[in-house]
Amino acid sequence: MCSSDLYQNAGASIAPTAGDIFNDSDMIVKVKEPQSEEVSMLRENQILFTYLHLSAASELTKGLVKSKSICIAYETVTDQNNRLPLLAPMSAVAGRMSIQAGAHCLEKPQGGRGLLIGGAPGVNPGNVLILGGGVVGENAATIATGMEAKVHIVDKSEARLKELEMKFGDRIIPLVSDEINLKDYVAETDLLIGGVLIPGANAPKLISKEMIGI
């Protein structure tokens, strides 16, 4: 934790309330999306710089439009190579955590089937299916292959799959999404990771309840 003294020693002023900050600032820099009470504090032409994820937050979107503030979403900021440098670190953490959390949920005490994702002598490893070969997918594959799971990665881009093959070698099985029957692979999967990204929009719904037996 950073104390108020550390901020003050660096030259910052400590405001008593969030309202004071919104009233006195031309730019608001946050990490999480604004709460409803914060949206009401925004004013016309005030700049808000934070993660927003508006595609899944219609009420927040309406509130920001009504405020007439200038909103810049970290997750849509691109660099000169059309990459998402502010989203990438969050995606890397999400990808790595997904395998860790998924492996935990497969344990019997958590209501899982009692599967050791990396297998054991005389026991086959678990099947991991990763949808999307971007930052989330690559980092999920890093952990899954490290745990010695059987890993399939699905992506639309053959070029991206070749890059992943260069990195992981025969530790992954690359699959071009247009050439496979996703339903068949899902049926054989122990751990399914969704990592498909459309910048600024909701991710496509690739998996139905029917596919996973719900």
Regions found by a protein language model. Give the residues of each.
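N-terminal Rossmann-fold NAD(P) dinucleotide-binding loop
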Residues: 137-138
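Glycine-rich Rossmann-fold phosphate-binding loop(s) that bind the pyrophosphate
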Residues: 132-134
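Glycine/serine-rich phosphate-binding loop and adjoining beta1-alpha1 elements at the start
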Residues: 36-127
